[in-house]
Amino acid sequence: MTVAKKHWFQIAFQLRGSVIGAIYKRVICCALFGVLVTLLYQLKIPVSQPILGSVIPSIVLGLLLVFRTNTAYDRFWEGRKAWGSIVNNTRNLARQIWVSVEEVSLKDREAKISVLNLLVAFAVATKLHLRGEPINSELEDLISTSRYFKLKSMNNPPLEVAFWIGDYLQQQYTCKCLNSYQLTSIQELLNNLVDNLGSCERILRTPMPLAYSIHLKQLLLLYCFLLPFQMVESLGWWTGLVVGLVSFTLFGIEAIGLEIENPFGYDPNDLPLDAICNTMKRNIDDLTSLSPNVRSHDLGETSNVTI
């Protein structure tokens, strides 16, 4: 989901990203029912029943819809915060590893670049995992061939990637390329990444309670189909149009909640996970283009600290 600056009327009449496609059939159905009730009224059939307006108080239905939409937006915002945290933790982890891990040989530099690519692989694997997609070519350039095929067989690929990163950190500590304080600090960032993964999984696998969704839909249908009987005496042939407008409003609010409650897909209102992953890849590439300010034994490099 990307938001470009547009004129007010451009946004108002924009179809992409709106819920019109999801609700127009229900709206037309309600409007036609309003026309049918009007026709019956014109044929002197006593269908006008204004008292039906008290069957479902408007304020009750409004509160239910507001609660539904707010709950869905909370899920959307929690998902965005989790991915924002993934970005920040990835940047901090990459910086800490690049600067703190000492290099003894060229292989150490290559290993550091590989583990930094694993950080991007974690984000990509998380994206695919949340979308229920298999491991694909997006990861081929980020990890070795053996690890690529290993991930294909895993039930939770991002968790496996986090394990590989943790294994690398432990190896560097064993080789005395990291001290205990550095290891603890970096592992805390890695733990935060796994926590972010868990937050996203919680959003994905905790849908709205079924009973609430069923009852809200039943109330919406009752309200919209009882509406013509309340209005037909005063509105006449305008009843169908007004019922259509009211149902458009109510069904639209409910559809917005459905649209944003799972923010990890491909819909226009979902989070731009592809763009976020690409941003992290560019950040890592920029970082690895810099020389790490650490002690390097066999690389012919020394730390230059200017005070």
UniProtKB/Swiss-Prot annotation:
InterPro entries: Bestrophin-like, YneE/VCCN1/2-like. One of its GO terms (molecular function) is chloride channel activity. One of its GO terms (cellular component) is plasma membrane. It holds the Pfam family Bestrophin. It is a multi-pass membrane protein. The chain crosses the membrane at residues 19-39, 47-67, 209-229, 238-258. It comes from the Bacteria. Belongs to the anion channel-forming bestrophin (TC 1.A.46) family. This is Voltage-dependent anion channel-forming protein alr2987.
